[in-house]
Amino acid sequence: MFKSGFITIVGRPNVGKSTLTNLLMGEKLSIVSNKPQTTRNNIQTILTGDDYQMIFVDTPGIHKPKHKLGEYMVNSATDSIKDVDLVLFLSNPCEEVGRGDKFIIEQLKNQKAPVIFVLNKVDESSPEKVAKTLELFSKEYDFAEMIPISAMKAKNTDKLLELMVKYLPEGPKYYPDDMITDVQERFVVAEIVREKALKNLSQEVPHGIAVDVIQMKQDDNGKYNIEVDLICEKASHKGIIIGKNGQTLKKIGSTARYELERFLRAKVNIKIWVKVRKEWRDNTSLLKELGYKKLK
């Protein structure tokens, strides 16, 4: 019997949703950073086994929005819960169930798919705190399963995969065996550049940036020539992004090029232009140009 289905991964910002997706896939498709609210779009990735096919939706973290981009991210995450076959709800060890987790649980009550509670980052907590957290969440919702894991250390993730197959319905193979994502290459390129910016910039700047791929061409020798706009909200941020003697921008470019060459399996030449677009996160038309469609 072949099983298949759509699986959404939900949770508060920075609980490890993208790390888990990347671990299960064995490919780096979702942007990973230690800063919250890193994922902005629902990334659809496909994992095919001998008797199953899972289509993952890696959502932005659900949080209280502060601008139109935040509204997009929350709408995108809550919409992903609807019409799926299985939900993975990620959280981390805690002393009490917080407001963010309770808000997600309320959204889960409106759908019929089974929900597996995944307690991530257990390697960073004591066994007593892990047990207490599982008990706390068991009182909040009737989960189909509850499982502690460490996505970073790949602890207990094989067991999680078995549980996911268990709860998948019988179904067809939606995508070819060798297809691992439905997003375009240009989107992944933009996400890689944004990840490197996130890792190299200070606290205030990162979430005020966006990346727009202006050009992506492959020459006769197979080398990619890529030009991107790195968009920020303030002129002062532009100076921070460029850095003294251009060093910060050079570091973003060099680390992005290395990752892009791994992803594209080809040589890459990348040029990054820093542009200021004041309050772009509250500009609906610009947000849509940048690919954020789910604004209400």
UniProtKB/Swiss-Prot annotation:
Region (G2): 37-41
Gene3D superfamilies according to UniProt: 3.30.300.20, P-loop containing nucleotide triphosphate hydrolases
PROSITE patterns: G_ERA, KH_TYPE_2
GO biological process, one term: ribosomal small subunit assembly
Location within or outside the cell: Cytoplasm; Cell membrane
Residues the record lists as binding GTP: 11-18, 58-62, 120-123
KH type-2 domain boundaries: 201-278
Keyword Nucleotide-binding (UniProt): yes
Stretch list, region G1: 11-18
UniProt keyword Membrane present: yes
Keywords carried by this UniProt record: Cell membrane, Cytoplasm, GTP-binding, Membrane, Nucleotide-binding, Ribosome biogenesis, RNA-binding, rRNA-binding
Source domain of life: Bacteria
One Pfam family this sequence matches: KH_2
InterPro entries: G_ERA_dom (IPR030388), GTP-bd (IPR006073), GTPase_Era-like (IPR005662), KH_dom-like_a/b (IPR015946), KH_dom_type_2 (IPR004044), KH_sf_prok-type (IPR009019), P-loop_NTPase (IPR027417), Small_GTP-bd (IPR005225)
Every Era-type G domain range: 3-170
G4: annotated span: 120-123
Signal peptide start and end residues: none
Positions of the UniProt region annotated as G3: 58-61
Region described as G5: 149-151
Identification of the protein by name: GTPase Era
